[in-house]
Amino acid sequence: MAQRYRIETQQYNEAFSDLESNCNEITFVNKGQAVYLNGVKMDNGDAIMIGGNAGEFCTTKFACVPSTPGNIEVYVIKKIYS
């Protein structure tokens, strides 16, 4: 049986420390200076996708900080079941 879901996209221009995923899949795309996502370095143009199987629900909290002082440009894309 098909399940309904929606896609949410959010742009972040400042560091964040407790972004709750609360979704089935989440993707981070860095379009600015280098950042650290939960300790993993992401350079400009890098993307990290965390996928889930049908029925799974991720509750991980994510933190994103710039590698040097300044603003960031990170896009967060979530797949959320209705």
Task: For each feature predicted by the language model, list its residue ranges.
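Surface-exposed ligand/attachment interfaces on beta-rich extracellular proteins
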Residues: 4-21
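Short intrinsically disordered terminal tails
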Residues: 1, 81-82
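Edge beta-strands of jelly-roll/beta-sandwich modules across compartments, strongly enriched
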Residues: 35, 69-79
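Tight coil/turn sites that cap or link beta-strands
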Residues: 10-12, 40-53
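Catalytic phosphate/metal-binding cores of nucleic-acid and nucleotide-processing enzymes, i.e., regions
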Residues: 2, 17-18, 49-54
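Exposed regions on extracellular, virion, or secretory-pathway luminal proteins
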Residues: 1, 40-44, 69
